[in-house]
Amino acid sequence: MSRSLRGAWKLWGSWCAVIAYAGFLAYMSLRQFGDSPIERAIDGVGRAYFHLPAYAGLAGLLTLVMPSSGARGRRVGIAFLAATAYGWLLEAAQIAAPTRSFNLRGLAFDAAGAAAGATAAFVFLVLREKKSRRGS
């Protein structure tokens, strides 16, 4: 398999992972919340706190799979905005979902998680670039 074809498959697979993860977030955000022991434990902690790692993961994935043309900062900003907007869209969609409700705290944790994930991915990219320069 040629190098360019292998790169295309890798990129396609990466975007499939982002789409699958976004679908998982939508499912978890919009499904009915039941009364199982796990769900009662989640309620005890507070559902909004789960937004932090969820949207950190989405923003991190987006940062890593976006094309590297242009400034890294732009890539991080776009990933942050996209993950935050997606979280806010799902938060607004919860208005119509039974057993769910719109929550301002959820909006704040979506944005905070997206910022943390995009920043962590940015640091990873910078360190990886420095390491590859030293190795060359």
Label the predicted regions.
Residues 130-136:
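Short, charged juxtamembrane terminal tails flanking transmembrane helices
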Residues 35-44, 87-115:
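Interfacial helix-loop-helix junctions of multi-pass membrane proteins
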Residues 54-69, 114-128:
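Membrane-interfacial alpha-helical segments at the cytosolic side of multi-pass membrane proteins
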Residues 1-65:
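"…centered on the first transmembrane helix and the immediately adjacent amphipathic helix/loop
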Residues 17-29, 75-95:
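Small-polar-interrupted transmembrane alpha-helices in polytopic inner-membrane proteins
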Residues 12-13, 45, 71-80, 103-104:
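Membrane-helix interface segments
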Residues 13-16, 23, 77, 119, ...:
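Alpha-helical hydrophobic membrane-insertion segments
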